[in-house]
């Protein structure tokens, strides 16, 4: 019969052995990501988890402006991947971020896209706005979506912002803007070039990049929020976005890359 002392030793040995075989509990990481990342965020998360197996990023997609408002008002997102640099900078100024500066991770591009075989996006903004076959013209919300601001700036640059008003269909974010074209609710849309690299949309219809002459770049920045200050994976994920692995994923999905991003 085992004595109490021997039984205690056995229990301690069993517990010690299992401590080396049980997997570490995954630590959640709440990420707010701009909608233009929707087609590659799963690939980015999977690649990050290879470097940090105990991380479990939970991603919400939406308009950068909406996430800005939510984080400013205390939403518990730990990382914010914005489609611009301005919203992260504002959160830093408001004291709602742990980062001291946004980390640039991608440069977005906008493209004209149509599924109508009779409509050629290569004709350009002015011609498409004037085309009577184009009854609805989709852009993202210029107030809350950086890609919407870029679309408005391009239309203003080409002198057709006022003319397009009667045809405008405004998406809450850039993903919804693409859906308007995809479902036939708009004959033409200004969408993110990255979205056209997705498995779902690649090869659908015709598209043409919108010239960036005279337009500011759509530089996209990431920050660790105040809520993420105590989670090492928040800073780890932001650093990962500057790694060769992440940059290759972003480039493959139609994004430009900022110079000087560090691993």
Model-derived features: positions:
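Exported/periplasmic ABC-transporter solute-binding proteins
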Residues: 26-52, 56-61, 65, 69-73, ...
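Bacterial N-terminal signal peptides
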Residues: 6-23
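Active-site phosphate-binding/coordination module
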Residues: 100
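N-terminal secretory signal peptides that target proteins for export/translocation
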Residues: 1-5
